[in-house]
Amino acid sequence: MTVSFEKTSDTKGTLSFSIDQETIKTGLDKAFNKVKANISVPGFRKGKISRQMFNKMYGEEALFEEALNAVLPTAYDAAVKEAAIEPVAQPKIDVAKMEKGSDWELTAEVVVKPTITLGDYKDLTVEVDATKEVTDEEVETRLTNAQNNLAELAVKETAAENGDTVVIDFVGSVDGVEFEGGKGSNHSLELGSGQFIPGFEEQLIGTKAGETVEVKVTFPENYQAEDLAGKEALFVTTVNEVKAKELPELDDELAKDIDEEVETLEELKAKFRKELEESKSEAYDDAVETAAIEAAVANAEIKEIPEEMIHEEVHRAMNEFLGGMQQQGISPEMYFQITGTSEDDLHKQYEADADKRVRTNLVIEAIAAAESFTTSDEEVKAEIEDLAGQYNMPVEQVEKLLPVDMLKHDIAMKKAVEVIATTAKVK
């Protein structure tokens, strides 16, 4: 195979390669075996025409296109490997020469990864809006939330206050006409929870059981029901009951109800503090990592990012997200219906920061290459086991789905991120 690659820009070039006679013969054999099944010739049963008779009747050239389709993927991959390039999109392939008895010559217009000039990526100084410190107030807030979760609702005769729960009947209308989904009965609504349209809950503060009030609101402009978006509505609302939370006593008994692994309130506070320390420490490390990566990317120089890489990243991110939804039993159609969005909306959402994600991945890849990371079989095995546990899949299935080269690439990327993050200093 003869191979050459000539760049026409930083991210585009022409790959020229040939297909030798032995490979062509293999392709012709495959092509003949495929097409002969549909050929009927007098004197032969359908599909039983000989190769010699076929060549005499149609000419061997009739098999060229099918033969090329059979051998091109392997030939192109071999040419790419020999030229040591990394295409990032499907090539545009043209046949330069295809004659009987000669090697076939082809050209492919390919898009490749851009040249990356790294700047500083170690010992970077970064600022983060995060802290590992856990305050007494945070522990008390966690405790109060747990106490609230075990609160009981008791009917009250006085007026509803923010935080109370009202049990209501309501009928909504726009311009005097009731609309679908605008009616409810014995609906429990915690005032201040933000469950209803903005402005609705505030108008029920001060009401008492047995009262009927007219609640006037305006639907948000981005409301999922387009026929209601931006419109004024009237809800005739009857308050059936007003209930207030009765908080349990904050003592050792409540502590045991909240967490059966503790015996006292002080033990519960200590456990909450430890959990907060762990979560805040993780969030702090994530913030440092993010800031350090952003700094390393900013220090690098990339001449241009091909549009094809942006498009590929958008589709990859969308497929990953929708695939995750399907694992939870939510089909794409169901997701778009629930959220009131469309595939175009999701595309625009991921397109907004696709350039940043591609740029970041390119720089991290370049750092991994600069550090010449190697990956052991033990590391690959550990990565497979980690993924199997993460996605609740058998190890064997992960091994089939993910090629070793891809796993090694991902491990190298993680090592590059670790170098960037662990050497960073926080201002």
Curated annotation (Swiss-Prot):
SUPFAM superfamilies: FKBP-like, Triger factor/SurA peptide-binding domain-like, Trigger factor ribosome-binding domain. One of its GO terms (biological process) is 'de novo' cotranslational protein folding. GO terms for molecular function: peptidyl-prolyl cis-trans isomerase activity; protein folding chaperone; ribosome binding. The keyword Cell cycle applies. GO terms for cellular component: cytoplasm. It is found in: Cytoplasm. Consists of 3 domains; the N-terminus binds the ribosome, the middle domain has PPIase activity, while the C-terminus has intrinsic chaperone activity on its own. This is Trigger factor. The gene is tig.
